[in-house]
Amino acid sequence: MTAQMFTIALLLSLSAIAAAGTIKTAPARTPSTQDDASFPPDGAPVKRFDAFTTGFGHSKRNFDEIDRSGFGFAKKNFDEIDRSGFGFNKRNFDEIDRSGFGFNKRNFDEIDRSGFGFNKRNFDEIDRSGFGFNKRNFDEIDRSGFGFNKRNFDEIDRSGFGFNKRNFDEIDRSGFGFVKRVYVPRYIANLYKRNFDEIDRSGFGFNKRNFDEIDRTGFGFHKRDYDVFPDKRNFDEIDRSGFGFVRRNVE
């Protein structure tokens, strides 16, 4: 009995000691007043000027903005795009607005678009809606359907359509029965040639005379030259209603 009472007394003593003990809790952590270094005071994330690549083969670098919804593309200011998926390469100081397959490019830029066999350089503007082509300033092109007219200080090599053009309006387009020669008059197939940009395209019934005059009735094409016909306007006007082509003003 004595041992049992001793055991009970010992247990009671231990319980009392445990109850009397002080349980210390960890002090509450005061919130830091230091701002996150990765965010500005307004809470917006810091804009980082680094390169990145997306799943559509797009590479973008430095001080630019991209808005790309679906296949639409908008790019602004001081950036570089390499869009190999669509065969597009664009560099330096330009703006692209590409909605669907429409294309608009302006000012001091270079385009190499091998997918459509197009190469264009320097000081020009391209507006390409659907497959139509419109280019202005220093060699204007208006290509509606498959009609094509290009002038001065540029080079086009468009092998996809069998077209090769070099240096001040020389054309050799054998794929479509087109041949251009200089200083060789020919009277075959209703053809007559004089000086500066002669075209002999007998396959399509083409007649061109003197400083880029074209009279092509077979395809609804009529062009008149300086002081030759009363309906002539300003050194190289083309009115090609059959293909919806109109070009005016001095080159």
From Swiss-Prot:
Highest taxon, organism lineage: Eukaryota
Q: Which UniProt keywords apply?
A: Cleavage on pair of basic residues, Neuropeptide, Secreted, Signal
Q: Which GO terms describe its molecular function?
A: neuropeptide hormone activity
Q: What InterPro entries would the database entry show? A: ORCKA/B
Q: Which residues form the propeptide?
A: 21-46, 225-231, 249-251
The subcellular localization recorded is: Secreted
UniProt keyword Signal, yes or no: yes
Q: Which GO biological process entries does UniProt record here?
A: neuropeptide signaling pathway
List where this protein forms a coiled coil.
none
Q: What is its main location?
A: secreted
Under the cellular component aspect of Gene Ontology, which terms does the record hold? extracellular region
In the UniProt record, the signal sequence range is: 1-20
Which Gene3D superfamilies does the record associate with it? E3 ubiquitin-protein ligase SopA
SUPFAM superfamilies per UniProt: Pentapeptide repeat-like
Family affiliation: Belongs to the orcokinin family.
- Database matches in PANTHER family: NEUROPEPTIDE-LIKE PROTEIN, NEUROPEPTIDE-LIKE PROTEIN-RELATED
Q: What does this protein do?
A: Myotropic peptides that enhance both the frequency and amplitude of spontaneous hindgut contractions.
Q: What is this protein called?
A: Orcokinin peptides type A
Record organism: Procambarus clarkii (Red swamp crayfish)
- Mind giving the lineage of the organism this protein is from? Eukaryota, Metazoa, Ecdysozoa, Arthropoda, Crustacea
